[in-house]
Amino acid sequence: MLIKQLSSSYNEYNNNYAASFLIGPLPEGIAQSLGFNIRSVLLKEFPYFAVKNIRFNPENNNYKTHIGTKESIETIINTILGIDFNYSFDFYKAMGLYKSKPKALFQENLSKAKFLCSAKQVGEGILYAKDLMLPVGIKCTTPYKIIAHVTKQNFLGFTFELGFLFGLNNNIKFENKLYSIKTYPIQNINIEIINSKKSFNLNSESIILSFTTKSSLQPIDVIKILSYLLLNKHLILIKAFQQFLD
């Protein structure tokens, strides 16, 4: 990966640095997936980063971005260099999205999901991490059983926090009380867990959670909940609508 600094400036009035960068070229098949990663890593490391205009150029698989912060230009560069692109590559490849057309694949899944929802079938609503674009108009009245794959490092204290994007109330605890999920209503929708179990995969050093929600949710609400975790690297989904659609 190459980083080319296109411009930089310093504003004495507000003590703010700004720089624009060209990031790439990136590996084929994952370049379009990394805009969220770039933004989320920068904002996680430095919440006061102003990350603007992340634009992808499909002709040469690179990104152009403009960043403003009170941190030095060197800090910005080091932060961008610290983004784990290999992690993203392995993740999407493992999900079968490498060198595929994920948007078209996702739209195909939506058609199947819409049919199953209309048939009121209960299945496992397992979502693609990178395609957080489900139209609001597609509704589902079936309970969701969501299977999540969580790394040990990001599963601190057996607690998820779906944070500030959605408000601050309504703690949810699993029945076995070994761990809890803190989540918050979205558009006045509460999630109530009625079944749960936990297992540990020694090979991947990962914890597998499964739980069933009692509330009727729209797919867009589930995606909003999970996308916050995904973009903050608290949660990695290992399947995508697979059993829900089969």
Curated annotation (Swiss-Prot):
One of the record's GO cellular component terms: mitochondrion
One annotated GO biological process: DNA-templated transcription
Top-rank EC class of the record's enzyme:
transferase
This entry's Enzyme Commission designation comes to 2.7.7.6
- One MF term in GO for this entry? protein dimerization activity
Q: Which reaction does it catalyse?
A: RNA(n) + a ribonucleoside 5'-triphosphate = RNA(n+1) + diphosphate
Compartment(s)? Plastid
Q: Which keywords belong to this entry?
A: DNA-directed RNA polymerase, Nucleotidyltransferase, Plastid, Transcription, Transferase
Question: Which purpose does this protein serve, as stated in its record?
Answer: DNA-dependent RNA polymerase catalyzes the transcription of DNA into RNA using the four ribonucleoside triphosphates as substrates.
Q: What does the similarity note say?
A: Belongs to the RNA polymerase alpha chain family.
Please describe the quaternary structure of this protein.
In plastids the minimal PEP RNA polymerase catalytic core is composed of four subunits: alpha, beta, beta', and beta''. When a (nuclear-encoded) sigma factor is associated with the core the holoenzyme is formed, which can initiate transcription (Potential).
- What is the protein's name according to its record? DNA-directed RNA polymerase subunit alpha
Biological source species: Helicosporidium sp. subsp. Simulium jonesii (Green alga)
Give the gene name. Answer: rpoA
